[in-house]
Every structure is written in C-alpha cells, then in structure tokens.
Amino acid sequence: MKPRHIPVFDGHNDALTRLWLSDHPDPVHAFIHERLVGHLDLKRCQEAGFIGGMFAIFLPPYSYVQQHHSNKLFDQNASDFTQQQIEQICLEQLDLAHQLAQYSKNIKICTSVQDIQDCRAEKKLAIVLHMEGAEALQQNPDLLDVFYERGLRSIGPLWNRPSRFGHGLNAKFPHSPDTGAGLTSDGKDFIKRCANKKMVIDVSHMNEKAFWNTVDILQQPIVATHSNSHALCPQARNLTDPQLKAIRESKGMVGVNFDVAFLRSDGQRNADTSIDVILEHLEYLMDRVAPLLHPRSKLRKGTHKRTPGRAGDAD
C-alpha cells in the first residue's frame, strides 16, 4: 500500500530558473515526463502529494551563471547582464511556465484561490507565478502589466542585490536583518502598484528597513514565503520576533526555508542536519505567527544543502 501524503502547497521553489539553466535539449518535456536532476518534476510532485506552489521567476547572479552555465551568457566578455537581457531572461522563464501548462493536461497556471482548489480536486499541479527580485521591472513600468496579464500574482520586490527599488539584503551570519537602507521612493511606489493589483508581496529577501517600509504601506497580509526565526538562527535573512509579531497582526504567514544555513544555530551549510531543526523553527513560527494556521512552505529546488534523508519531493 502506498503511503498517504498530506497535500503540500509549496511557498517557494526555483524550478523555472532551473529549467532555464538546464542543459537538457527539452527541459519542459523532461519536467513533465522524466525525473530531472534536482528535487522537482511532475512525477515526483504527483508521488508526494505536492499539489502546487509559488514558482519563482528569478535572475541568477551573473557570477553563478558564468561559472556553472556559461552557455547562457549573452556576451562571454561582459561583467553583468544588461537591463534588456534581464528582462529577456525573466520573460523566457515565464514562457517556460506557460509551456508546462500547454504541454501537460496535469499542470495549470493559477491566478485565483478557486483555480488552486480546482487543481487540487482535479489532481493537477497548480503553478502560481512569483517573481523573486523585480529587477526586470525596474526600467519599464509597463512590464508589470505584461507579466500580470500572463499570470504573475506574487512578487518579492527585492533580492540580495541593490536595485532601483531598494538596497536588497546580504545573507550575513551572524547578523541582524538591518543590513542597509530600505525601499527607495520608486520601490514604495512599485509596492503600491502591486498591492493595487491584489498581488502577494513577499518580504523574504527584504532587509529590516525595507520590511518596515512595506508594513507601513500595505493594508493586506504580510507574507514571507521562505524565511526562518532569527532567534534560532541569527542569519540576516531570518525574521526577528518584532517582525513576526507584525506579520501576525497583519494576518499574514511565514513559510519555513529548508536551506540548512538558515536553519542551524551555527549558520553552517552542513547537510548532516537533523529534521528536528526544521521542526524547531516550524513550532517557533507557529507559536508566534499563527498558532491556529500552520503554514508549511519550503525552499526546495535551488537550496544548496537540504536535510539528510530527502532525495526529493516524494520524501
């Protein structure tokens, strides 16, 4: 008898970026019909009761692409992506998401809660499109409308890099989340535009000043899709108790990040880490954010080191 799986809706994964980086001649076909290298593909989602999640459109650091996927570079002699290239990369990942839905009757891009509920009932994989770091939208304001019309419903305005919208957040350990300036005036206006579209605003990669800027702007639940407790792991990426209190007061939620460097009290990226460490963060967050609502979101594909005993989503 197969084990019965609890339905999982994942708060954050990097599957689209991995497909964009893939050397496979047909990564969309591979995701649908094969077992891809990494943690996430359709078959393992179905085996694990993985009903869907927030699929991130993300610009990988230039240095990472240069070192590991140099065939994806537009100019081998450049030192960074141009704005036009940033926009193209993100649009290509958006196209990959639509190809997944086009070529599989078991995958759907969802733009509403009802869509997600329908996918669960029909045993389809629900893709909610998210953008992690909004650099692709910083020069051409109309691009937000383009991405929205094609299904984007969640956005993390900042990543670790500085942009027109704000300072970003360096993942320092040990360190407080106060790593620099907060949102720029353009960043505040951008968040207001996204909020007017009823989009989810993800604070997971915001430094402390940007976080509080966002709290002051939003009249909606505050969401951190993949962040942990700073009290348990003093990593700048994690959330302090006052931040958790603000999220609770907004009726928001926090998803646990499975990257062990953001879980362990010593900040080490050591895969030999007990699952008990995850449970400790989960219990801490539930107690402080939503004792009656237990979000179990995970940073999956894209994590450098995961806890042992898990080869992928089926585990």
From Swiss-Prot:
Gene3D superfamilies: Metal-dependent hydrolases (3.20.20.140). Residues 296-315 are annotated as: Disordered. One of its GO terms (biological process) is proteolysis. It comes from the Bacteria. PROSITE patterns: RENAL_DIPEPTIDASE_1 (PS00869), RENAL_DIPEPTIDASE_2 (PS51365). Residues 296-308 have a biased composition (Basic residues). One of its GO terms (molecular function) is metallodipeptidase activity. CDD domains: rDP_like. Belongs to the metallo-dependent hydrolases superfamily. Peptidase M19 family. This is Uncharacterized protein in PQQ-III 3'region. It comes from Acinetobacter calcoaceticus.
